[in-house]
Design a protein with these regions (language model features):
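Short, well-formed alpha-helical segments that are part of the catalytic scaffolds
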Residues: 11-28
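Conserved donor NDP-sugar-binding/catalytic core segment of glycosyltransferases
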Residues: 95-128
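Catalytic beta-strand/loop signature of glycosyltransferases that borders the donor
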Residues: 190-201, 213
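A recurrent flexible, glycine/aromatic-enriched loop bordering the glycosyltransferase active site
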Residues: 133-153, 171-172
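Non-catalytic, C-terminal membrane-associated alpha-helical segments of glycosyltransferases
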Residues: 212-223, 229-279
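Short beta-strand-to-loop acidic/aromatic patch adjacent to the donor-nucleotide binding site
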Residues: 84-95
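Glycine-rich, basic loop-to-helix element that forms the pyrophosphate-binding segment
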Residues: 62-79
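Acidic donor-binding loop at a coil-to-helix junction in glycosyltransferase catalytic cores
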Residues: 160, 166-178
Length: 279
């Protein structure tokens, strides 16, 4: 069976995944869709209610949590890449509406970066695309897993995610940006705000402990700087380092001692990563 769109989703718990699957199943009345789902940590789900004439589901299992890029690569390897299909990598808390499926074939003709709206407030954008048509290398920061629609022919050529990058690794970010750059080198992405999905808006740092914020910022900084240097984007990597220190200065001026400390440490981690990996 051929599919028009294939979703590759990894899941480490069953908190949000049911809502994600339900949004696809209930709103898809037009596309031949396959959901490839990797359940980790012995997560168990009843999937029968999500299978429809338009939506098929294939499930793989892991008894423990593995890094995100490795998990996605397992899904990529599990299924022959369908040349005529489009692929997406939603998070387990992504949500889709009927508009997405109804207008997909009218809007998507090649590699595309779509908009992402906030789940909590659907008029607020989590990520809005520029009005210009073509994505450039410098648009790497506008590419995240949930908004990339990628042709099967492109994925055939690009292959796997870089398993040094992403959640669960020392370089804990940048895997989506890296994949975007590699795909964009084969077929240039276009921007579209006419198609979207939904994602929870970011949590405010005031609601998190310093230790949790630090872990996130350090991991992000290492990943993004490493990714940019991998692609020889030295100026962009240097800008990421500088932004860390500028963030510290800004928070000091606001007398926000907690976040000033976080940005100071994060900036230093970025600087160390820059020096360690520049060639």
């Amino acid at each position: 069976k051929s599919f028009q769109i294939i979703f590759l989703i990894t899941c480490t718990n069953n908190v949000n995944i049911s809502t994600c699957l339900e949004s696809i199943s209930k709103n898809n009345h037009s596309l031949n869709c396959l959901i490839l789902l990797l359940l980790q940590n012995n997560v168990k789900l009843s999937l029968e209610s999500y299978i429809t004439p338009y939506t098929s589901i294939k499930v793989l299992h892991k008894t423990h949590t593995i890094p995100l890029s490795q998990a996605r690569n397992i899904l990529l390897k599990s299924e022959r890449i369908h040349a005529g299909s489009f692929y997406m990598f939603p998070d387990d808390d992504s949500v889709f509406d009927q508009h997405f499926f109804e207008f997909f074939t009218k809007i998507i003709t090649g590699n595309t970066l779509i908009a992402v709206k906030g789940t909590q407030s659907k008029s607020v954008y989590f990520l809005k695309m520029p009005e210009r048509k073509w994505a450039l290398i410098s648009d790497f920061d506008k590419a995240i897993s949930v908004n990339m629609v990628i042709k099967g022919t492109t994925i055939q050529k690009v292959g796997n995610f870089d398993e040094k990058l992403g959640v669960g690794n020392y370089y804990g970010a940048g895997e989506d940006n890296d994949y975007f750059l590699r795909c964009n080198a084969i077929e240039q992405f276009v921007f579209s705000n006419d198609l979207w999905n939904y994602h929870p808006l970011p949590c405010k740092n005031t609601l998190q402990t310093v230790s949790k914020i630090l872990i996130r910022y350090k991991s992000y900084g290492r990943g993004v700087v490493y990714m940019l240097l991998k692609h020889r984007m030295i100026t962009e990597a240097a800008k990421v380092v500088v932004k860390g220190y500028l963030g510290c200065i800004k928070k000091l001026m606001m007398l926000n001692w907690k976040m000033a400390y976080v940005y100071l440490i994060a900036g230093s981690v970025r600087f160390y990563t820059f020096l360690k990996n520049i060639k």
